[in-house]
Amino acid sequence: MLTLYGREVSSRLLLGTARYPSPAVLADAVRASNTDILTISLRREMAGAKKGGQFFELIRELDRHILPNTAGCHTAKEAVLTAKMAREVFRTDWIKLEVIGHHDTLQPDVFALVEAAKILCDEGFEVFPYTTDDLVVAEKLLEAGCRVLMPWCAPIGSAMGPLNLTALKSMRARFPEVPLIVDAGIGRPSHAVTVMELGYDAVLLNTAVAGAGDPVGMAEAFARAIEAGHQAYLSGPLEPRDMAVPSTPVIGTAVFS
């Protein structure tokens, strides 16, 4: 079980709800993934007006924990306002905090992120901050009151997979007791296995599933991959060696002269 802000969930896969071919495909992908947590962009869905209402009804029928996000916000003020609106709509203190600083890379504005995190934590929100793999920023977010960190492994939607394993390893080692969820950049189930083998607690996916040729099949593949990576981490995988090591014991081997 994974505990996030005192709430236990059985799945280590968090799933985004945007860009699926149809509501039916989204619903089937959610079920195939076995996820307990769905992320939702309040701004995007409210912009759809009538369709947004139909979407929210579908989400309610799926009966998962809702993690609203502040996608599309570029300032701390925008993010805080969106978070407050999401709290009213979804009746939850959970918020996935995104403050985007660059239009091309969608890299977080870490200065505004920390500012918004401090405000929201002080107002009783349970903040899931989308951040970089920078350890100093991570420290500042924890000092602001965050009890979960969500570092990227590559730019949002890039599907490149983990670009800086050293940084991800360092973050895991530096914060052994903090739930760490890789958010952004995952493209394949093998990428998810890689980060889970490092000891990360969960993976958040959206584009990798929604944009796949078969989103439902991909959701199931990721669910299996994340579980496999977590089990591998718990089982203690071998560390790489510079030299060959025989797998067959030498003792008892016949010697011919």
UniProtKB/Swiss-Prot annotation:
Its EC number is 2.8.1.10. It holds the Pfam family ThiG. GO terms for cellular component: cytoplasm. GO terms for molecular function: thiazole synthase activity. It catalyses: [ThiS sulfur-carrier protein]-C-terminal-Gly-aminoethanethioate + 2-iminoacetate + 1-deoxy-D-xylulose 5-phosphate = [ThiS sulfur-carrier protein]-C-terminal Gly-Gly + 2-[(2R,5Z)-2-carboxy-4-methylthiazol-5(2H)-ylidene]ethyl phosphate + 2 H2O + H(+). It is an enzyme of class 2 (transferase). The keyword Cytoplasm applies. The active site is at K96. Pathway: Cofactor biosynthesis; thiamine diphosphate biosynthesis. It is found in: Cytoplasm. Keywords: Cytoplasm, Schiff base, Thiamine biosynthesis, Transferase. One of its GO terms (biological process) is thiamine diphosphate biosynthetic process. Disulfide bonds: none annotated. 1-deoxy-D-xylulose 5-phosphate binds at G157, A184, G185, N206, T207. InterPro entries: Aldolase_TIM (IPR013785), Thiazole_synthase_ThiG (IPR033983), ThiG (IPR008867). Catalyzes the rearrangement of 1-deoxy-D-xylulose 5-phosphate (DXP) to produce the thiazole phosphate moiety of thiamine. Sulfur is provided by the thiocarboxylate moiety of the carrier protein ThiS. In vitro, sulfur can be provided by H(2)S. Belongs to the ThiG family. Homotetramer. Forms heterodimers with either ThiH or ThiS. This is Thiazole synthase. The lineage of its organism: Bacteria, Pseudomonadati, Pseudomonadota, Alphaproteobacteria, Hyphomicrobiales.
